[in-house]
Amino acid sequence: MIRILHSVSNMDRAGIETMLMNYYRHIDRSKIQFDFLCNKKKPGAYDAEIKEMGGNIYHTPGLNPAKYPSYLKCMKKIFEENPEYKIVEAHNGALGVYALHAAKVNHIPVRIFHAHGASITRDWKLPIKLVCKALLPSNMNQHFSCGIEAARCYFGEKVVERNDYELIPNAIEVNRFVFDSTIRNRIRHDNHLENKHIVGHVGRFMSQKNHTFLLDVFAEVSKRDSLAHLVLLGDGELMDAMKEKASNLGIKDRVTFVGNVGSGISSCRIGSEEKAIYPFLLL
């Protein structure tokens, strides 16, 4: 059996993690198994399902330069105790170089960097991320990307021109999102939204998802449509700030913050919407 060690932050319901689970559920797990390397200690929403399917979850120190000696020591122990690992795939953006360098030092032959974004977030970690990005080429030997722009961002124009990367689409289970009027009516009834014009958004509360602009837009929509109602699915560090913003805009009673819910519930709620809005930012 082939075991692939995926480096992520933790296995919560976020875009990259959900994409991995979509693939994990459909591969032949008698031939290939996924294990997960998490640099956050908190439990993830998918942990129980991963263990039920035969996967392992390892926790490491955080991804920052001060903790790297401890991180490297932890990784060495994992590889020594699991000599079957021949493939490591990093999904952490530029910080994925931590896992890839540890894999290289421990002689793991296949080291994949999987690009998921077309830009690098400009926050206080930016200088560290730029150094990590510069170190990626010497530590990875396989290029995966969800799209051309993400490949261009992390691998450079020459790699894209040579087509020297694997394009891995973010597959979804489309049948789960087929419209069902019965589900639509039930969701609306349960949430007292039978006669509302629902606008929906699914996304983690983080800067890239641009909830600030979304709420500004909906505030204007609500002035023109007295029946408009915004439903936000997801969780994240900016959720409380967005609740405060909705209150300040005077639309608190017209916005429902659902929080983090199971994927099945998400697909049902999406079916209850009339419109969806996704004002993402490239940071």
Task: Indicate where each model-derived feature is located.
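Short His-centered aromatic/hydrophobic patch
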Residues: 90-96, 115
